[in-house]
Every structure is written in C-alpha cells, then in structure tokens.
Amino acid sequence: PVWSWHVGTAVRPREDRGLVSDDLYIAAKRVVSLLADAGHESYFAGGCVRDRILGLLPEEYDIATAAHPPQVRAIFPRARRVGEAFGVMLVRQDEYMFDVATFRTDGSYADHRRPNSVTFSDAQHDAARRDFTINGLFEDPIKGEVIDLVNGRADLEAGVVRAIGDPRKRLDEDHLRMLRAVRFAARFNFAIEDETAAAMQ
C-alpha cells in the first residue's frame, strides 16, 4: 500500500475527564522537546494520540523518535533499559515515566507475540508496523499537528477498527491483536472493518 502523509491540527482533550493531571501532558511534551532540540524527530505515538483526538485525557504517553538508545541516554542520562534491543528506553521527566521508542520495522514473529528482531527505521515504517490504523497516528506537540501515515484519522471519524496493511499478516504476527480489536470496538463503540473481522475468524 501507499502510505499518505496527512497533517492536521491536534485536538486537545476535554479537561472534565479527570483521568490524570495535565502535568502529564506537559512532562511528555518536554521529553519530545528535549529530543527535538537535540536534532531527533520525535512524536507522541499510538493510543495517546488516538485518545486526544477522541477528546479523552490519556493515562500515559508513548514517545517515538529517530534517536537510537545511546542518543536517548545522552539526553536523559538516567534513562533505563526496558527493551533496548527493541529500541525502547524508560525516561523520567518530573515525576512521570515515559517509554521512548526508536522508530523501527519488525522482523518475523516466530512466537506470535514479539518480533525476533527489529531494524531501526523512520516514522513511516514505524507507523506501518503497528496494529490498527487508529493506533498508528503520531502527534507533534510542539507544532500541534497530527501526523497520519495510515489513514487512521478517517477511521477514527468513521468509528472503524481496521488492521494496518494485510489483516491476516498483522493478526498472525501477534494473536493478542484479535482481542485488542474486540476491546477497542467495545470501548469506543466502533465497528471492526470487514477484512479485519474476516481475518479474525
């Protein structure tokens, strides 16, 4: 498939949800800013972007970046390894902890749960490896823009859970993705897209 790049204004969450303080957002934005100031393309990624567009206040923020683990540690010397082989570092900012993950592509999934290997890549390939289009969005909190490489925003607006790429391949990589599809559909009152639903049978 051809992944299109759409940029739009991010939607700030409604403040009446009360899940967490907005201090979490400020701390997460600070992590992105420090990475960007060091010259590394960096974004909010995945579920936090989805929730913000839906008007929900995220309980956590994941950050995706072009920085490799040693570069992350150079900026955050106390960063901890939580999956360095997969490009994931745990960074503390203020009193909050954030997963900071290097953009990557995944190798084969021999155990139907985790990739055997990863290759560090770019934002486009990182979005393409994710499970569902609604979780494949990035947000640049500095510019206040949503970066949509997988047409996820249209599926959010339509209320659709759709696998990225080939649904059978995507679900076979990690069998728990089928449960996640059902959970997202129930949580947001979304429909599971036909080809994705067929791949779950």
Where are these regions (language model features)?
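Catalytic cores of the polymerase beta-like nucleotidyltransferase superfamily
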Residues: P1-Q201
